[in-house]
Structures are given as C-alpha cells and as structure tokens.
From Swiss-Prot:
This is Recombination protein RecR. GO terms for molecular function: DNA binding; zinc ion binding. GO terms for biological process: DNA recombination; DNA repair. It comes from Pelodictyon phaeoclathratiforme (strain DSM 5477 / BU-1). InterPro entries: DNA_Rcmb_RecR, Rcmb_RecR, TOPRIM_dom, TOPRIM_RecR. Keywords: DNA damage, DNA recombination, DNA repair, Metal-binding, Zinc, Zinc-finger. The lineage of its organism: Bacteria, Pseudomonadati, Chlorobiota, Chlorobiia, Chlorobiales.
Amino acid sequence: MRYTSAALESLIDEFAKLPGVGRKTAQRLAMYILREPRAEAERLAEALLEAKDNVIRCSVCQNITDVGVDPCALCTSKARDRSVICVVESPVDMLAFEKTGHYKGLYHVLHGVISPLDGIGPDDIKVRELLLRFTMPQSPAVREVVLALNPTIEGETTALYLSKLLKPLGIHVTKIARGIPVGAELEFIDEATLSRAMEGRTVV
C-alpha cells in the first residue's frame, strides 16, 4: 500500500534506505516525525547535516572524529598503550571493544574487509594507511597488531592478507581467540565474550 501523499512516500522511501530498516519500520519512523512538533523535525535535520559537515576520519587510525580534532582523542591519549594496535572492520567494532574497558591499546579501522565477490580489494579499504603507521618517520614502536575482524570468510581472508604484510616488518601478529560464533558481527557480541576473546588472542 502506498499513501496518497507524495511527500510522505518520499520520506518513507528515504528511511527505507537505511541499513536494517524495512518499509514497515520506515512507515513508523515517518509517522513519528509527522506527529512530533516541527521543532523536533528541525533538530533531527540539523543533527544530520551537522554530522555530515563535521564528522571526519582520523588521519592516523581512520576512526571517526570531529573536524578540528585530528588525530583523534584515542590516538593522542597518553593513557593508551602505544605498542599495540587492534585492527577492526568498522568504528562500531572499535566501540564494542572500548565498552569492555579491557583493551588499552590503539586502534586501526579498515572500513571494510576484502571481498572479491563484491569487488572489494585491499586498495578499497584502509590497508595502506595501516602500513604507513609502521613506515613513517617517528612512528611509535609497535610490537603487536591484534586482528579483531568479524569471523566471516571475508574477515578471515583479510586477516590472512594483513598477517602476510605485517610479519616481514618484524611485528608480532595475533588475532582474537575463537569462541565468537562464525558469521557473527562483533558489535552484537556481549562485552564479557569480547574481553575473553581479547585476553585469549593467539599468534597468527
């Protein structure tokens, strides 16, 4: 069923483009917006535009940060262990590990994984930026890279590729322990399981 209002249909169509949002959920979101005062809709629109205008990727770790805060707060923090870098697929995965409160090192966000079937190769994710962290002058002395990628075929392929690049540089390469279900996404794994996976990481 489609509504007689073209403006409402357009709003529903835009909501339906969001990840994990089907048409029914999009309809509920659209109806919620219509019920709320105009000021609420304006605040939502302003927040969306502000995020698009002011959120950037950290030039070092590729995590999200604000304009004017680059490198990001994690990269510049003196409280972090600069000898360890945890490589994750997305900023959401990084946040999942931060919520455990267990890991105290640095991060690198790939923004994807190698997936030949989808036409995604090493040049399409932040591999080059990762390697630069070990080859640039005055780079911190990193002794370990933890590969914390989702336990999927693509994640395993990416982990294998990265280990082959990093080992010749004399870097100790590990990956989080098994115990996370195959095919699961790290953002949905509970904090205790993620902590155990980090503690029990194994050599690649």
